[in-house]
Amino acid sequence: MKPSDAIRGEEGGIRRLIEAYGFIEPKLFGSAARGDDHEGSDLDLLATIPPTMAGKISLFDIAELEEELQAMVGVPVDLHVCNNMPEHLRQSIEREMVTL
């Protein structure tokens, strides 16, 4: 199944799950956001760690969240943290990202 098809109707649940882990501003980017995804593509998501949660969200939390999201939508999920991203990469992503 294409990621763009897998998330159809699940956007609210995806957003709530990401926010339950303490992240804010969840966004979709990559091939699913551009509409050129295919079966076998992963789902690229971007979220921000707010200042109040700095140092409280671990890599284990991120991995666990990715697993929960994958179970929810049935396709591989790659969650990127905006705070840790180089500026040039974030600017590139911002051109195609879609708010969930």
Predicted features by range, described:
Residues 1-25, 33-35, 39, 52-100:
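Catalytic core of pol beta-like nucleotidyltransferases
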Residues 46-50:
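Short hydrophobic/aromatic beta-strand micro-patches
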